[in-house]
Design a protein with these regions (language model features):
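Non-catalytic signal-transmission and effector/linker regions of two-component phosphorelay proteins
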Residues: 1-14, 119-133
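Conserved acidic carboxylate
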Residues: 17
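Charged docking surfaces used in two-component/phosphorelay signaling
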Residues: 24-32
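Acidic, metal-coordinating helix/loop segments flanking the phosphotransfer/catalytic sites
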Residues: 39-58
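The feature encodes the CheY-like receiver
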Residues: 66, 84, 96, 114-115
Length: 133
């Protein structure tokens, strides 16, 4: 595969979100922009995926998840050597300074409050994907 062919492969974004409506909205938005999407609905499934799957281009990660929360999942991402550079954007309805600081301290690259504005979220995704290119 040459550089031109590699550039045409759509970036894969991992969504870890337990709210079905939000995950469907995220998938729709991202697929319309040409991204490939993998969705997992709970922290246990995400931990297994992080341990065994190839790295995505970016992770959109809910904070409050069943079984394992988003803060712990960020730590798992940062512990896996081949995933360390993957940008992690945390999504949450919790709008407190404490949660923002906790997410950033855990290793998240960005923190987005729900309900989010679609264009803003897409701009953040593009910024993080471009920064990692």
């Amino acid at each position: 595969m040459n550089i031109e062919q590699a550039a045409r492969i759509p970036a894969t974004i991992l969504i870890v979100e337990d709210d079905e409506h939000i995950s469907q909205v995220l998938r729709f938005m991202l697929e319309r922009q040409g991204y490939q999407v993998t969705h997992l609905a709970d922290g246990r499934a995400a931990a297994g995926h992080i341990a065994s799957a190839s790295r995505p281009a970016l992770v959109l990660l809910d904070v409050m998840l069943p079984y394992i929360d988003g803060f712990e999942l960020v730590r798992l991402v940062r512990e896996r050597e081949d995933w360390r550079g993957v940008p992690v954007l945390m999504l949450t309805a919790k709008n407190t300074e404490r949660d923002t600081v906790r997410a950033l301290d855990a290793g998240a690259n960005d923190f987005v409050i729900k309900p989010f504005q679609p264009n803003e979220l897409l701009a953040r995704v593009r910024r993080h994907l471009t920064a990692g290119a």
